Protein backbone atom coordinates (compact mmCIF):
# COMPACT_ATOMS: atom_id res chain seq x y z
CA UNK A 1 0.00 0.00 0.00
CA UNK A 2 1.41 3.38 -1.02
CA UNK A 3 1.72 6.16 1.51
CA UNK A 4 0.43 9.58 0.55
CA UNK A 5 1.49 12.71 2.35
CA UNK A 6 -0.51 15.92 2.19
CA UNK A 7 1.60 18.73 0.78
CA UNK A 8 -0.41 21.45 2.50
CA UNK A 9 -1.00 23.77 -0.44
CA UNK A 10 -4.11 25.41 -1.85
CA UNK A 11 -5.35 24.35 -5.29
CA UNK A 12 -6.43 27.48 -7.17
CA UNK A 13 -7.18 27.43 -10.90
CA UNK A 14 -5.25 24.20 -11.37
CA UNK A 15 -2.12 25.45 -9.61
CA UNK A 16 -0.83 24.46 -6.17
CA UNK A 17 -0.22 27.66 -4.18
CA UNK A 18 1.55 28.03 -0.84
CA UNK A 19 2.14 30.86 1.58
CA UNK A 20 5.14 31.35 3.85
CA UNK A 21 3.01 31.02 6.96
CA UNK A 22 1.92 27.49 7.86
CA UNK A 23 0.27 25.58 10.66
CA UNK A 24 0.76 21.94 11.57
CA UNK A 25 -1.83 19.27 12.18
CA UNK A 26 -2.36 15.52 12.11
CA UNK A 27 -5.30 14.72 14.32
CA UNK A 28 -5.18 11.01 13.56
CA UNK A 29 -1.65 9.81 14.21
CA UNK A 30 1.10 12.44 14.17
CA UNK A 31 3.63 13.44 13.04
CA UNK A 32 2.17 16.72 11.96
CA UNK A 33 1.95 17.94 8.40
CA UNK A 34 2.45 21.61 7.56
CA UNK A 35 -0.48 23.34 5.88
CA UNK A 36 -0.25 26.69 4.14
CA UNK A 37 -2.33 29.39 5.81
CA UNK A 38 -4.97 30.92 3.56
CA UNK A 39 -4.95 34.68 3.09
CA UNK A 40 -7.46 37.25 1.86
CA UNK A 41 -5.39 37.56 -1.33
CA UNK A 42 -5.67 33.80 -1.95
CA UNK A 43 -9.42 33.97 -1.38
CA UNK A 44 -9.66 36.77 -3.95
CA UNK A 45 -7.55 34.75 -6.38
CA UNK A 46 -9.79 31.70 -5.91
CA UNK A 47 -12.96 33.78 -6.36
CA UNK A 48 -11.65 35.30 -9.61
CA UNK A 49 -10.74 31.82 -10.90
CA UNK A 50 -14.20 30.51 -9.94
CA UNK A 51 -15.88 33.41 -11.75
CA UNK A 52 -13.81 32.71 -14.88
CA UNK A 53 -14.71 29.01 -14.71
CA UNK A 54 -18.38 29.84 -14.14
CA UNK A 55 -18.68 31.71 -17.42
CA UNK A 56 -17.11 28.96 -19.50
CA UNK A 57 -18.77 26.08 -17.62
CA UNK A 58 -22.14 27.85 -17.43
CA UNK A 59 -22.28 28.18 -21.20
CA UNK A 60 -21.18 24.62 -21.92
CA UNK A 61 -23.62 22.11 -23.36
CA UNK A 62 -25.58 20.01 -20.86
CA UNK A 63 -23.85 16.86 -22.08
CA UNK A 64 -20.43 18.41 -21.45
CA UNK A 65 -21.35 19.57 -17.94
CA UNK A 66 -22.73 16.14 -17.05
CA UNK A 67 -19.64 14.45 -18.51
CA UNK A 68 -17.45 16.76 -16.40
CA UNK A 69 -19.23 15.78 -13.16
CA UNK A 70 -19.06 12.09 -14.09
CA UNK A 71 -15.34 12.46 -14.86
CA UNK A 72 -14.78 13.94 -11.38
CA UNK A 73 -16.63 10.95 -9.89
CA UNK A 74 -14.47 8.58 -11.96
CA UNK A 75 -11.28 10.29 -10.77
CA UNK A 76 -12.38 10.11 -7.13
CA UNK A 77 -12.99 6.38 -7.54
CA UNK A 78 -9.63 5.91 -9.29
CA UNK A 79 -7.84 7.65 -6.41
CA UNK A 80 -9.94 6.10 -3.67
CA UNK A 81 -7.09 4.83 -1.48
CA UNK A 82 -5.10 8.07 -1.67
CA UNK A 83 -8.14 10.22 -0.92
CA UNK A 84 -9.07 8.08 2.07
CA UNK A 85 -5.52 8.08 3.41
CA UNK A 86 -5.07 11.84 3.06
CA UNK A 87 -8.54 12.47 4.48
CA UNK A 88 -7.67 10.41 7.55
CA UNK A 89 -4.42 12.32 8.03
CA UNK A 90 -6.11 15.70 7.64
CA UNK A 91 -9.23 15.06 9.75
CA UNK A 92 -8.57 12.13 12.06
CA UNK A 93 -11.73 10.42 10.81
CA UNK A 94 -11.55 6.61 10.52
CA UNK A 95 -11.06 5.01 7.12
CA UNK A 96 -14.51 3.39 7.10
CA UNK A 97 -16.20 6.74 7.69
CA UNK A 98 -14.26 8.37 4.84
CA UNK A 99 -14.93 5.44 2.51
CA UNK A 100 -18.65 5.87 3.12
CA UNK A 101 -18.44 9.59 2.55
CA UNK A 102 -16.43 9.04 -0.62
CA UNK A 103 -19.21 6.79 -1.94
CA UNK A 104 -21.80 9.42 -1.04
CA UNK A 105 -19.78 12.10 -2.83
CA UNK A 106 -19.47 10.02 -6.00
CA UNK A 107 -23.21 9.32 -5.82
CA UNK A 108 -24.00 13.03 -5.48
CA UNK A 109 -21.84 13.92 -8.47
CA UNK A 110 -23.50 11.25 -10.62
CA UNK A 111 -26.96 12.31 -9.40
CA UNK A 112 -26.34 15.94 -10.38
CA UNK A 113 -24.99 14.78 -13.75
CA UNK A 114 -28.20 12.82 -14.38
CA UNK A 115 -30.31 15.86 -13.41
CA UNK A 116 -28.35 17.98 -15.88
CA UNK A 117 -28.92 15.47 -18.68
CA UNK A 118 -32.63 15.17 -17.86
CA UNK A 119 -32.99 18.96 -17.79
CA UNK A 120 -34.48 18.89 -14.28
CA UNK A 121 -32.74 22.15 -13.44
CA UNK A 122 -34.69 23.90 -16.22
CA UNK A 123 -37.91 23.77 -14.16
CA UNK A 124 -39.82 27.04 -14.40
CA UNK A 125 -43.21 28.07 -13.05
CA UNK A 126 -45.63 30.84 -13.79
CA UNK A 127 -48.57 31.81 -11.63
CA UNK A 128 -50.48 34.48 -13.56
CA UNK A 129 -51.85 37.49 -11.80
CA UNK A 130 -55.32 37.24 -10.25
CA UNK A 131 -56.30 40.89 -9.92
CA UNK A 132 -59.82 40.03 -8.71
CA UNK A 133 -58.71 37.57 -6.02
CA UNK A 134 -60.11 38.18 -2.56
CA UNK A 135 -59.14 39.37 -0.04
CA UNK A 136 -56.14 40.70 -2.01
CA UNK A 137 -55.12 40.47 -5.64
CA UNK A 138 -52.27 38.11 -6.50
CA UNK A 139 -49.43 39.59 -8.53
CA UNK A 140 -47.94 37.85 -11.55
CA UNK A 141 -45.27 35.47 -10.21
CA UNK A 142 -42.56 33.63 -12.12
CA UNK A 143 -39.88 31.24 -10.92
CA UNK A 144 -36.95 30.32 -13.12
CA UNK A 145 -33.94 28.37 -11.92
CA UNK A 146 -30.73 29.76 -13.34
CA UNK A 147 -27.10 29.75 -12.31
CA UNK A 148 -25.99 32.91 -10.57
CA UNK A 149 -22.27 32.24 -10.20
CA UNK A 150 -19.78 30.88 -7.71
CA UNK A 151 -20.74 30.39 -4.09
CA UNK A 152 -18.56 30.12 -1.01
CA UNK A 153 -18.89 26.83 0.84
CA UNK A 154 -17.67 26.81 4.42
CA UNK A 155 -17.57 23.05 4.73
CA UNK A 156 -17.57 21.15 7.97
CA UNK A 157 -14.42 19.19 8.67
CA UNK A 158 -16.55 16.26 9.76
CA UNK A 159 -17.67 15.92 6.11
CA UNK A 160 -14.48 16.75 4.18
CA UNK A 161 -15.73 15.30 0.89
CA UNK A 162 -19.51 15.19 0.70
CA UNK A 163 -20.07 18.82 1.64
CA UNK A 164 -16.84 20.76 1.45
CA UNK A 165 -14.76 19.49 -1.45
CA UNK A 166 -16.61 17.73 -4.22
CA UNK A 167 -20.09 16.89 -3.05
CA UNK A 168 -23.53 18.41 -2.83
CA UNK A 169 -22.99 22.14 -2.39
CA UNK A 170 -20.00 22.30 -4.72
CA UNK A 171 -21.52 20.17 -7.48
CA UNK A 172 -24.89 21.92 -7.29
Predicted regions and their residues:
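N-terminal Rossmann-like NAD(P)+-binding subdomain of aldehyde/semialdehyde dehydrogenases
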Residues: 1-139
Amino acid sequence: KMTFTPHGKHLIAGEWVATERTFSSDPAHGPSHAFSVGTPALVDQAVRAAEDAFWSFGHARREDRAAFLNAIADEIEARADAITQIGTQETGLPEGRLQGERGRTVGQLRLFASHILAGDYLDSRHDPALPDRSPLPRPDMKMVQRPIGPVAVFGASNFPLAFSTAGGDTAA
